Amino acid sequence: MTAVVERELRTLYVCYFSLYEPLVQTQVLPYLRGMSRAGTKVWLLTFERTMPEHWTTEPEEIWRARLRQDGIEWLTLRYHSRPSLPAKIVDIVNGTVRVIRTVRRERIDIIHGRSHLAALIGLLARPFTGALVIFDIRGLLAEYYVEAGNWRAGSLLYRITKMVKNFLFRADGFVVLTDRARAEMFPAVSEKPIQIIPTCFDPERWSAPQEDIREAIGARGRTIIVYAGSLGITYLTKELADFFAVARTIDETAFLLVTTHSSPRLIREQLDRTGIPAADFHIAYVPPEKLPAYLCASDIAMSLVKPGYSKLAMSPTKFAEYLASGLPVISTRGIGDMDAMIDNERVGVLLDDLTADSYAKAFRKADALRKQPGFADACREVAHRCFDLHSVGTARYMRLYRALSGSPDPVAVDEKCATTP
């Protein structure tokens, strides 16, 4: 491994998403701003596509100037979607050429690839640049698509993705989201630096005064059960509606709040199926800056994900955000490190199975937890200790960067999170 010269670290962060996507706004830019403040010069390459109307529509020039003020230089390429495999090849070629040119021109030290395709671009560019490459592993991609029903195990795309993954382990450093992923992917001691960095929350977004959401959604005096995030088969939308139907039989004041960028029809159809009246739920897209107000107005949080092998590498963003809002979390089992954290930190309830009896048991336990003195503060303490964007997320990224560069690491990271059984 070639050591980085003694000067400010320079990184090119490659992200195969649009800057305007909510995921990039909440799970990429805050980390890059933190790394910039820590002394790293940052370039960001995104792949842009046509934006849905509910995403930000501010012109590129405004965003480019804003990011430059944060110490981030923003580069863009066009995202191609069809036909699927040829489009990916075009993006990989275009991305590799752009990365090579940028790294050479700006004397960049580290190419940071977020997920498989971005890391592949970095590794293809490495022989032409001499830069070090980070593979930021966001999950077990091939297995995830098979479990979601999008791919068939053994299909061409599945086999290509598995081959690419093996190639990606030639990277110089790695990020994984969970302890379980680290144990599965790197069972032996690795000579290469690895950091476990879960999806974190930005405490600054939770420090602002929260508006009265209960009145706005017609839920004053109700027990609000909140679900934030994607909908669909992977996220057990049918089971979410079934759970709420059971909760209503126990607490007639129960009210379901769903904040999602998915089609509201997905959950509305399921609520209609169970006979839930419209007065007992609210479904809306909530921009990231307003989400804390909605979560802090709630009482109990739901995190439902279809179990499967790929989920051991998953770190749901909503989990950190729920805890930051002081909420007990009801979750399916087998999702990343959540089982161990919920059990050991006592911040929620794990569903035994997806049955009415299990739903009733979990709701009663969560309802009792939220009423315990000091429970909300205990949840917030866990959130700050284990998922703080600055003291955990950014600090661990900088630890990885310094390990790659051979620089001393002055950053103290709190490792005391109960993520093992």
Name each model feature, range by range.
Residues M1-W63, D242-D251, D414-P421:
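N-terminal subdomain of nucleotide-sugar transferases
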Residues D91-N94, T129-I134, A142-F167, P203, ...:
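Nucleotide-sugar donor phosphate/pyrophosphate-binding loop at the beta->alpha transition
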Residues T260, R265-A293, I300:
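Nucleotide-activated donor-binding/catalytic signature segment of Leloir-type glycosyltransferases, i.e.
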Residues D353-T355, R370-R402:
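A charged, aromatic-enriched C-terminal amphipathic alpha-helix characteristic of glycosyltransferases
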Residues P22, Y235-K238, A284-Y294, A301-A320, ...:
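Nucleotide-sugar-dependent
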Residues R180, C200:
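Carbohydrate-associated surface elements
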Residues V97-R104, L120, L124-F128, L141-A142, ...:
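Membrane-proximal helix-turn-helix segments that form the acceptor-binding/catalytic region
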